[in-house]
Curated annotation (Swiss-Prot):
InterPro entries: Asp/Orn_carbamoyltranf_P-bd, Asp/Orn_carbamoylTrfase, Asp/Orn_carbamoylTrfase_sf, Asp_carbamoyltransf, Asp_carbamoyltransf_Asp/Orn-bd, Asp_carbatrfase_reg_C_sf. Gene3D superfamilies: Aspartate/ornithine carbamoyltransferase (3.40.50.1370). One of its GO terms (cellular component) is cytosol. L-aspartate binds at K81, R163, R224. It comes from Brachyspira hyodysenteriae (strain ATCC 49526 / WA1). PROSITE patterns: CARBAMOYLTRANSFERASE. Pathway: Pyrimidine metabolism; UMP biosynthesis via de novo pathway; (S)-dihydroorotate from bicarbonate: step 2/3. GO terms for molecular function: amino acid binding; aspartate carbamoyltransferase activity. Keywords: Pyrimidine biosynthesis, Transferase. Catalyzes the condensation of carbamoyl phosphate and aspartate to form carbamoyl aspartate and inorganic phosphate, the committed step in the de novo pyrimidine nucleotide biosynthesis pathway. This is Aspartate carbamoyltransferase catalytic subunit. Heterododecamer (2C3:3R2) of six catalytic PyrB chains organized as two trimers (C3), and six regulatory PyrI chains organized as three dimers (R2). Belongs to the aspartate/ornithine carbamoyltransferase superfamily. ATCase family. It is an enzyme of class 2 (transferase).
Length: 359
């Protein structure tokens, strides 16, 4: 049994194994594939709205022969009555062979892991991480570009709150990626992520426009500006239309084999006139969520046995009840946690939401 909480907890070999298993399952005989998780139950608990992630996990479960329980509206669950996340996870575990959870609180998935032995897949926790999106992004990059080694990726839009950006950066770090973060200052990439990149000697630049790097990059990764992450509506209004791309500013101005990805949903950041160009891979990317999530579920439950060694985390974790995470959207402010702190050579970080302590 294993959990998929953070892409940081996977080794390069484990990532490659997930992608290889996803490819095998995508090409497998459907009748044989339905035997893999026959008799198992997946419970999906979504505390935030979702279309692609929730439906692709459901599709993945059915294709593996797995039954599904769950909710996608916490208003229709005991959460509305005041039930804690701790109690929700404990109860759901009693009915499940695997839990898929999305939550609005940063670090919720890491906390859930502490209170159950049931395998958990993090389907997005606030502005923190989204490992299943990262793995399907890596799968798409490998399928479309032939490799995920040494790719130059420009992240455009909301790099501050974009959990898909944060997780994909962590994933591509293993493969010597090079990054461009293109955002208005108010939604630019957080310093705690840049500290990780600096420590790993990964090349990156913060820029205010994407045009200057179109001839260099292998992938243009667009994101929407997320209204739900802003406390100040005025900040959102100032930046919500910061970047828009169309045929006029892409075709003939980028590398011939560059691809455009987007975790979706899009608002107006990608004009539909790009949809039928060779650069647009975002709908293929969304489709790739099914085989990737099949692989994650099968490996998490040991329905398919992993053949690679589990990554050993080489940092110290301590419990410190006196430490307060500076992120007011961290699970430590909503649940009774063990208040763990990760001690690294370049700083102390919240075990749950990854924010630097003391910043």
């Amino acid at each position: 049994m294993r959990n998929f909480i953070s892409i940081k907890e996977l080794s390069k070999e484990e990532v490659i194994e997930v992608l290889d298993v996803a490819k095998e399952l995508d090409n497998a005989d459907s009748k044989e594939r339905r035997k893999i998780m026959d008799g198992m139950i997946m419970t999906s608990i979504f505390f935030e709205p979702s279309t692609r992630t929730r439906l692709s996990f459901t599709s993945a479960a059915y294709r593996l022969g797995c039954k599904e329980l769950g909710f996608d509206n916490p208003e229709q669950s005991s959460v509305k009555k005041g039930e804690s996340l701790r109690d929700t996870i404990i109860m759901v575990s009693a009915y499940s062979d695997i839990i898929v959870m999305r939550h609005s609180i940063d670090g919720a998935a890491k906390f859930a892991e502490e209170v159950t032995n049931c395998p958990i897949i993090n389907a997005g926790d606030g502005a923190n991480e989204h490992p299943s999106q990262t793995l399907l992004d890596l799968y798409t990059l490998r399928e479309e570009l032939g490799t995920i080694e040494n790719q130059k990726v420009a992240f455009v839009g909301d790099t501050r709150y974009g959990r898909t950006v944060h997780s994909l950066v962590d994933g591509l770090m293993m493969f010597n990626g090079q990054f461009y973060f293109i955002s208005p200052d108010v939604i630019q990439i957080p310093d705690y992520i840049l500290k990780e990149l600096d420590n790993a000697n990964i090349k990156y630049k913060k820029l205010s426009n994407y045009e200057e790097v179109l001839k260099e990059i292998d992938c243009l990764y667009m994101t929407r500006v997320q209204r739900e992450r802003f406390d100040d509506i005025n900040e959102y209004e100032e930046v919500k239309h910061a970047f828009r791309i169309s045929k006029d500013n892409i075709v003939g101005k980028c590398k011939d084999d560059m691809i455009i990805l987007h975790p979706l949903p899009r608002v107006d950041e990608i004009n539909i006139d790009l949809d039928d160009t060779k650069y647009a891979k975002y709908f293929i990317q969304a489709r790739n969520g099914v085989p990737t999530r099949m692989a994650m579920m099968a490996l998490a439950t040991d329905a398919i046995k992993s053949k690679v060694k589990r990554k050993e985390m080489n940092y110290e974790v301590v419990e410190n009840k006196e430490v307060v995470c500076p992120n007011n959207k961290c699970v430590t402010h909503f649940e009774e946690t063990k208040n763990r702190v990760v001690k690294k050579g370049y700083g102390d970080f919240c075990y749950y939401c990854n924010r630097e302590i003391g910043k």
